[in-house]
Amino acid sequence: MRRRQIALVMAAAMAASALSGCGGSGNSGSAATAAPATTAAAASEAPEAGGESAGETEGADGEAASGDKEGYLSTFDVAGAGDVSLDVMITSLGDSDGGPFLRGVMDKYMEMYPNVTLTPVECSMNDLYTTLITQATAGTLPDIFTMSEAYSANCLEMGMMVDNLPELLGEDYMNGLLDVAIENSTVDGTFVFMPWQNNTSAMVYRKDLFEEKGIEIPKNWDEFLEAAKTLTEDLDGDGKVDRYGSAFAGTRNDSAESRFQTFALTFGCDFITPNGDGTFTSGFGTDAYKNAMTTFVRLATEEGITPPGFVETGYSEAYTMIAADEACMFFSASNVLGGIYNANPEMKGKMGSFPMPTAEGVSPVTSFSSVGMTISNTCENPEVAADFLKYLTSVENSVAWNEATCRLPVVKDALTAICENDEVYNGFVEASDSAVIYPPFAGLAELRDICGECWQTVVSEGVAVEDAIANAAAKAEETAKTYSN
């Protein structure tokens, strides 16, 4: 794994005065000066933001069209582009919080430019990969579609997207993004997708209950277990647990499986390691993976700290449990707070976040990932598509997006504004100081699914955990070989 000590760029911007309102517990000073470590080879592979043209597309009069009046970095004469129709497939369109917001942004853009028609296309994140493969094979990709690092290598390999995305977005826009987000969106020197959501993983928790019971923030998984046991209670005296210490996602889909990849990191396990010669080595046969999977299953099913039904508990079920005062902790990106608040607005002010616990002997670590969008290679109006994406992710819209969903952006100025205003994100900021990004690997979705199959066979079919792990290791080794040159 390419490990990066990732201090969010906004920490540097806020170091002089604002970190007291947003930083983590005592570590924000180091975050202010740290920067993503980059090898010479990695630096040579990174795309130049904007290229020679600085991303400015000339309008009919030969001058770059200015979008300052609209509050975003528009560099194309959209109004002079004639009638334009774009299909926009963003996975959040189907969300109860993000969907209405996105449709509102699309409507406002069409009000600004009556010559543009934006058609929303829904697709769940869990169905994204298979949907894109089908569409790419049939030549029916939408003009704009969701992309993440889990599928970016496949996207590049299949030639799904335009090959000049930095130029379309422009140098000024690219310079406003977190450096780590740009790196995370880059495969073999090609900028594959425009990052949008900052998905640093941390633990969200009932801050009010921790304070009420005098529980200290757990630094390792043993301390996490003790905290969860303290929080697990029979509140009405009927002999049944009413509130559990934690929730774990155990469904067999990318949402739960990607969380386990973060969990495995905290045991020192890298799913996949590039060998530098086009081949890869799986980490599933290591003691770190065995310890991670064994502990994951034990915490989720054997310690009595989680609600029943682990393998049926997905992301939405987990945040609903917290909103209903049935669980107290869950690790995720910041968007889980939006789900909790949506389900129960009274939870605002009661929640907090802290960095992921780790296994004994493992330094603090978490994962950084980003969901974003890219433009199809079949799009007939890529300049207009890029202009809409810049409007969607403007500082104003990014802050409003956070208010609607609690998702953190990768636009530096927007991230600064959000974190200055709400300490609930402190744990995510502190966690960013020890975050890593995953290496591009076209078989990542397959490795994750092997993990989901592993814990589900243990819990649902009674397979011994040692046997399930051995089977997973064998499958992961084959996957690594399949995608090696």
Kindly give the residue locations of the regions a language model identified:
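Short, solvent-exposed loop/beta-turn-alpha elements that line the ligand-binding surface or hinge
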Residues: 78, 163-177, 236-237, 245-254, ...
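Extracytoplasmic "Venus flytrap"/periplasmic binding protein-like
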Residues: 104-177, 208-219, 320-321, 326-329, ...
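Extracytoplasmic "Venus flytrap"
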Residues: 72-80, 86-103, 254, 438-442
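Hinge/lid segment of periplasmic solute-binding proteins
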Residues: 48-80, 124, 148-201, 216, ...
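Extracytoplasmic/periplasmic substrate-recognition and gating elements
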Residues: 107, 111-112, 117, 212-213, ...
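Long, aromatic- and glycine/proline-rich binding clefts that accommodate carbohydrate-like moieties
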Residues: 180-184, 351-355, 402-453, 457
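Glycine-centered hinge/linker elements that transmit conformational signals in sensory
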Residues: 228, 278-310
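Conserved C-terminal helix/tail region of periplasmic/extracytoplasmic solute-binding proteins
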Residues: 50, 54-66, 211, 301-304, ...
